Regions:
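N-terminal twin-arginine translocation
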Residues: 26-32, 43-63
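Beta-propeller blade signature
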Residues: 201-208, 364-373, 421-422
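Beta-rich catalytic cores
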Residues: 125, 267, 364, 390, ...
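Structural signature of eukaryotic scaffold interfaces centered on beta-propeller domains
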Residues: 127-143, 265-273, 395-401, 510-515
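N-terminal secretory signal peptides
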Residues: 1-29, 42, 46-47
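Blade-edge beta-strand/turn elements of extracellular beta-propeller
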Residues: 82-93, 106-117, 213-259, 371-388, ...
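Carboxylate/His-rich catalytic cores and anion/metal-binding grooves
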Residues: 178-236, 272-347
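Beta-propeller fold recognition
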Residues: 190-201, 214-227, 416-497, 501-504
């Protein structure tokens, strides 16, 4: 995403990391650290201990070894439109956008001639991915075997004009191109085009073929392990037992009036891999796909206020509007609206209650979706205890037997925060390969934290809990009508809770990683104006 597409939704007075750094640089010793090449990591490394709670952690500076630590020669600079790899390495396409998972549909034409709905093809904008090896008993293996599947995110439909014979169509006119970011021309779209664009998103799981040395050579069409998880795939809504009923109340729509399930996943960017062998598809820029047509009725003030904080449609389109966000997925009239597959993207209050419309549909996105890549029959799960925001990655600290697990997560938007989820359950290697059941054990119950950095090089993990009076007493002139009344609000409206406790704004926290040698946690911050 370009900086111009990334709308800033955080107008809190919380300090920005740039300001924290500026204050830190007033100390000559810290300026010398930067001049010495150790960079910000030595000054502001994330506290690693999963149980540190609100404790202050100081990060000692360690000297990096002299010389290059890369085990290969870097590629030379190039302006060619091709993938470049270091000497001694090769690159090969395993699968590409539009390739089929099953032989019952035609091979991809690359001309837009496909008449299927794309739910059995690889999506577009390949992003986070991980490989999962399979042992002789069909269970997850942490070491290489002769069989593997590749789980992969498909983030965006910004280039979906290429799926259709003559570009995107609206108002009966073709040859158009709409990103998700405010350039749809507010005219009706054809159903098949919209279905392709919807199903272009999500996650693919595909068995990869391996040569005699274990190197992937391609993928296996018709493998029983192949599947797609799209925005239309049924998912369970799970979370802490004491708050689950209230969380599910925020998921109530005409599709599921109990809120126990939701549909699919959207705009998956970064990913995560659990110690027990499941996959996280992290839902990032999901907020831009919804709209409210002209002359619609607005939902209540609390919903509208929360939408402002998340960048979701919070005002109806004017009758004279010529552009809107999303790609007009709620507009088709030439196909049946089966299971409200189109109307769900209209998030106005069209019914008397939330159970009669889709005003709550945005609440069903913004989570880590857990998928068992080795069990095609296992329903994906929205892990609500890990919070709702623009999830970019969910990286797990080094598991220690008998200790809680810690997952580190970034909210990938300008001025947003870094989070941590610490499990209540302690790690037991017997859960290795335990699938979604293991996920229930570790991910339903735990504590959610947000990071605050100080100019002296220390930092705190602040727990996000309704018992904190900064949260329970939160008010804002910008988000009039919003207040926290229960812990479920904290988990569904996590950004606002982080605002309340004074978390440090960051420059778009994107991918994270854990150093396997010492457990250090790193995040790439990718967007500022400098």
């Amino acid at each position: 995403m370009s900086i111009n597409d990334d709308v800033i939704c955080n107008d809190s007075n919380n300090p920005h990391f740039q300001d924290v750094l500026k204050d830190a640089m007033k100390d000559p010793s810290r300026r010398n650290i930067l001049r010495g090449g150790l960079g910000l990591a030595s000054m502001f490394a994330l506290p690693m201990l999963p149980g540190c709670g609100g404790a202050t952690v100081t990060n000692p500076v360690t000297q990096l070894p002299a010389g290059s630590i890369l085990g290969f020669s870097a590629v030379t600079k190039s302006i060619l439109d091709q993938v470049a790899v270091p000497s001694g390495y090769t690159v090969k396409v395993l699968h590409a956008t539009g390739d089929r998972l099953v032989s019952s549909i035609p091979a991809y034409s690359n001309t837009g001639a496909e008449t299927d709905d794309w739910s059995q093809r690889f999506g577009d904008h390949h992003d986070g991915m991980d490989i999962f090896y399979v042992d002789s008993n069909g269970r997850y293996s942490a070491t290489a075997t002769s069989k593997a599947v590749l789980a992969m995110n498909h983030e965006s439909s910004a280039d979906s004009h290429l799926l259709h014979p003559r570009g995107q169509t609206s108002g009966g006119v073709n040859g158009k191109k709409f990103t998700q970011f405010g350039d749809w021309d507010v005219k009706a779209r054809p159903g098949l085009e919209v279905l392709k664009e919807i199903n272009l998103h999500g996650i693919s799981v595909a068995e990869v073929s391996l040569d005699s040395t274990g190197k992937p050579t391609g993928y296996v069409v018709d493998s029983p392990l192949n599947r797609r998880i799209t925005p239309q795939t049924l998912a369970d809504v799970r979370g802490p037992a004491a708050h689950l009923a209230a969380i599910r109340a925020s998921f109530v729509t005409r599709f599921d009036t109990t809120g126990a399930t939701s549909r699919g996943t959207l705009n998956n960017c970064g990913h995560g891999k659990t110690p027990w062998g499941t996959y996280f598809g992290c839902e990032e820029n999901w907020a831009v796909y919804f709209n409210m047509p002209a002359n619609s009725t607005l939902p209540d003030a609390k919903i509208i206020a929360s939408r402002k904080r998340y960048g979701v449609s919070n005002a109806v389109l004017s009758s004279t509007a010529t552009v809107g966000s999303g790609q007009g997925w709620y507009t088709p009239t030439d196909m049946e609206d089966t299971d409200a597959r189109f109307s769900r993207w209209n998030v106005a209050a069209t019914g008397a209650t939330a159970a009669q419309d889709f005003r709550n549909e945005p609440h069903t996105f913004g989570y880590n979706l857990e998928v068992d890549p080795l069990n095609p029959n296992a329903r994906p799960v929205k892990r609500t205890a890990m919070g709702r925001f623009a999830h970019e990655a969910a990286v797990c600290g080094i598991p220690v037997v008998g200790k809680p697990l810690a997952f580190y997560m970034g909210c990938d938007s300008r001025n947003e925060y870094i989070y941590k989820f610490v499990t209540t359950a302690v790690w037991d290697p017997a859960d290795f390969g335990g699938g979604i059941a293991a996920g229930d054990k570790y991910l339903n119950e735990g504590k959610l934290y947000v990071a605050k950095f100080n100019s002296d090089g220390t930092g705190q993990w602040i727990e996000l809990n309704i018992s904190n009076t900064l949260i329970s007493g939160y008010t804002s002139s910008t988000y009039t009508g919003f207040s926290f009344t229960k812990q479920a609000d904290v988990l569904v409206f996590t950004r606002l809770a982080a605002d309340a406790v004074g978390a440090t704004k960051m420059d778009r926290p994107e991918w994270g990683a854990v150093n396997p040698a010492n457990g250090e946690v790193y995040f790439a911050l990718t967007n500022n104006s400098n």
